[in-house]
Curated annotation (Swiss-Prot):
GO terms for cellular component: plasma membrane. Keywords: Cell inner membrane, Cell membrane, Ion transport, Membrane, Potassium, Potassium transport, Transmembrane, Transmembrane helix, Transport. The gene is trkI. InterPro entries: Cat_transpt (IPR003445), TrkH (IPR004772). It is found in: Cell inner membrane. It is a multi-pass membrane protein. The chain crosses the membrane at residues 20-40, 47-67, 81-101, 143-163, 196-216, 246-266, 282-302, 334-354, 403-423, 465-485. Pfam families: TrkH. Medium-affinity potassium transport system. Probably interacts with Trk system potassium uptake protein TrkA. Main K(+) transporter in osmotically adapted cells. The lineage of its organism: Bacteria, Pseudomonadati, Pseudomonadota, Gammaproteobacteria, Oceanospirillales. This is Trk system potassium uptake protein TrkI.
Length: 492
């Protein structure tokens, strides 16, 4: 009797999580049907792989729903932490099925690496001869990143501020409030965000097509640009369009659109026309991009590269790395030591909170600068009282603690991952840049192996699994995962 009660209590605690996961898996299966239809029309053998994958995902979703359908979804904070991590892990796992069963016939390690990289919108790849893949698989790679982009926006707007992860309480809005009274407004903001995301994607696809891309390439690059994911339909990434500068400028624009806060787009459409330009995150990101692009363009021109070519290539690749998209139109690691070091530093920055971008996020650097300024003030005026504000909100101890803790564990994770990779035999540059690009969800690293002109395929399997962990931890803002590893969390 006691055992039965214990099982029932356990089911009630975990049922809301399983029920939400069932819905997410169902959505994944529905989107798998899109490349399946393309493959059926083109009579490609990969259609069978997608059919089997859909059947497996639907079976898991149906079983979870049957077990939990009578139990209402009411999530407590601990369930939100578990759900956030499990959703990314399980979706990445299921998304890898077509890559294992399909024409590439990847090993489990390579398939999971590719899907984790896609869903987390990192953009690192182990695939070669991408041009030879079926249209369905090319489309699936784009869809995975596009779905990951949606998940990132929802997480950044509605979940992480609620969980107070890494100073994200700064961006607490009605969409971050999970009380019953506010849920209708949360749903409204979710619909508005999805509409804007889809609208930008359609606009990007049309622009790329009119700019000279094929219909399939236009659609895939539109999805991966807005998701700041970086998957392309060529081994050369955007280098395949290096002779078409109009496409590079379009790509720069749409990557930037994906890296800005989507909540501010909603405010803009609702009448607050200056919402974007007045936001300190946006101001900081645009200023950083302007200064870096200007400096590196001057550097490239001084090296003998034509001015317009320098400006185009620098703008595209700087925007790509800062927004953590990961496209490459040129091997910028060969631009010289100055550019090499600059791109390594830019790997950590990231875009804005509430966007599809990864990295540390620009607001944490801004908050750190405010904390540094206050500390210098205290040294000069020991009895002074200083209250810094960010976006007209006071920086409370709760927020500053979150930012400091996140920053510490972010770099600790990079350092630990780099050490693990070096123990597996990777050279210093590959280990350090690989760890940084994984945790920051950027995509390419530096050096000959995993740089903009390289690929992650040569790495040992153990290194790929470590990088998968790094990509997931980076996407889940580090602390969301670490809290699950503490005994205190499970006792409560």
């Amino acid at each position: 009797m006691a055992d039965t009660r214990r099982v029932t209590d356990t089911l009630r605690r975990w049922a809301p999580i399983l029920k939400v996961l069932a819905v997410l898996w169902l959505v994944l299966a529905i989107f798998m049907a899109i490349p399946l239809l393309v493959l059926i029309v083109e009579s490609e053998p990969d259609a069978l792989a997608f059919g089997l994958s859909i059947a497996i995902v639907l079976a898991a979703a149906t079983l979870s729903w049957i077990v939990t359908w009578r139990i209402p979804v009411s999530l407590k904070p601990w369930q939100m932490f578990v759900l956030t991590t499990l959703s990314w892990v399980t979706i990445s796992s299921f998304a890898s099925l077509p890559l294992v069963l399909g024409a590439p016939q990847l090993s489990l390690t390579n398939a999971v690496f590719e899907s984790v990289s896609a869903i987390t919108t990192t953009g690192s790849t182990i695939l070669v001869h991408i041009e030879d893949l079926s249209d369905g698989l090319k489309l699936w790679r784009g869809i995975m990143q596009w779905l990951g982009g949606i998940g990132i926006i929802v997480m950044g707007i509605a979940i992480l501020p609620f969980l107070k992860v890494g100073g994200m309480r700064l961006f607490h809005t009605e969409s971050s409030d999970w009380s019953d009274k506010v849920m209708p407004r949360t749903g409204g903001i979710a619909k508005a965000t999805l509409s804007i995301y889809c609208g930008f994607t359609l606009l990007a696809a049309m622009a790329y097509y009119l700019g000279g891309m094929s219909p399939l390439d236009a659609v895939v690059h539109a999805m991966t640009s807005l998701a700041t994911g970086g998957f392309a339909n060529s081994d050369a990434s955007f280098g395949a369009y290096a002779e078409q500068p109009q496409l590079l400028w379009m790509g720069s624009l749409f990557m930037l659109c994906g890296a800005l806060p989507f909540v501010l787009y909603i405010r803009f459409l609702r009448g607050s026309r200056m919402a974007l330009l007045r936001d300190q995150q946006v101001q900081g990101l645009l200023l950083l991009l302007l200064l870096v692009i200007l400096a590196l363009t001057i550097w490239r021109v001084s090296q003998g590269t034509p001015a317009f070519t320098s400006l185009t290539q620098v703008t595209f690749n700087v925007v790509s790395v800062v927004t953590t998209t990961g496209y490459a139109s040129d091997d910028y690691s060969a631009w010289g030591a100055t550019a090499y070091v600059a791109f390594f530093y830019l790997t950590f920055v990231g875009g804005c909170s509430g966007s599809t971008s990864g990295g540390m996020k620009i607001f944490r650097f801004q908050v750190a600068m405010l904390l540094l300024r206050d500390q210098l003030r205290y040294l000069i005026h020991a009895s002074g009282v200083f209250v810094s504000r960010y976006n007209n909100q006071p920086l409370t101890d709760d927020i500053t603690r979150g930012v400091v803790a996140f920053s510490f564990f972010f770099f600790l994770t990079v350092a630990g991952l780099a050490l693990g990779l070096s123990l597996l035999g990777l050279d210093f540059t590959t280990a350090l840049s690989g760890a940084a690009t994984a945790v920051a969800n950027v995509g390419p690293g530096l050096g000959e192996t995993i740089g903009p002109a390289g690929n992650f395929a040569p790495l040992p399997d153990a290194a790929k699994w470590l990088l998968c962990v790094g990509m997931l931890m980076g996407r889940l803002e580090i602390l969301t995962v670490l809290v699950l590893l503490t005994p205190m969390f499970w006792r409560q």
